[in-house]
Amino acid sequence: MDTHSLLTPTAPRRRLRAGLPLLAVLCALAGTGVAQAQAPAAAPPAASKDDSAIVLVGKDGWLFPAWGSLSEVDMQAVDASTRLIAETKARLAARGVRLELLLLPDKVLFYEDRLPAGKVVSASVEKRYDTILGSLQKAGVDALDARKVLAGVRAGGTDVFYRSDQHWTQAAADATADALAARIKQTVPNLAGEPGTGTPLGKETRERRYGDLAELFLPPEQRAAVGRETFTVRRAAESQGLLDSGKAPVHVTGHSMVQAYFGFPQKLSNALDRPVTVNWKAGNVGPWIMLLEYLESDDFRTNPPQVLVWQMFEPVYGFGPQAQGQWDNASIMTPAQFTARVNKALGQ
């Protein structure tokens, strides 16, 4: 398991593993490495003029991953995922760990006007984020409205996603981290640890490169037409280093959006003024196995956090642990198996 304290941002890694489904390939350029940005699993075809099955080429060089439905919302699947999350929250609470479900919104919601001609977001998908939040609230899971946070950033004239990449900008990650830190301080006012132990924020640098969607899925001529863009990266402060142990009152588990390259865990630690640890993993593993890998780890057994942030992604929220063809074979399990492993990891 890739469990770290605040990972030092490094340049994107471009190594692809042959034979992986589309899901694994989609995020191969994600910051410090590949993580599970979710997408339907399928063998990626060779780049061609018609790449619409993989990436939507929109207006002004805007690219969108094509694995989220623009027209339909499977409410049965949404509610099934919510039930598992609510059950997990209750079991964690019994162990003294508060669950913070962090649902990140779809890129397309903020840039519908940049979609290709003829592509529109249906009314149900436009409301999908709020629909999921409603499902969670009905089940007793109160979650941060990250869409509202990002909408505020966007209203201020700052982009919240990169033009040719599937990932969020540092401004979006920072705003979300600040909002989540405020929630945590309110709900858990007595965080363990000492003041002054949060991560100091380093200087911002800028990198010119192709976004992952352009790099991986566009033929050379089209990639050149889309062009490189500037990524803002906050380098590690000189005083920042890895923790000697896994002791931290807050842990984050999720996919590539929460890796250090995009700045979220560092900003969360800085805002909380406490250490934060994070685990994420390369490939199409999905959020369910990532949570289990942390709960089943020595880090959790010896140093359970007070708050566990479990990050999910709106377009694939309904993909449960049993989602054949979405996660790799080693990650597939029935909901009952997922629950049994959670119970065992928590000693219940």
Residue ranges of each PLM-predicted region?
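Bacterial N-terminal signal peptides that target proteins for export
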Residues: 3-23
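Bacterial N-terminal signal peptides
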Residues: 21-31
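Extracellular glycan-modifying ectodomains
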Residues: 2-7, 36-348
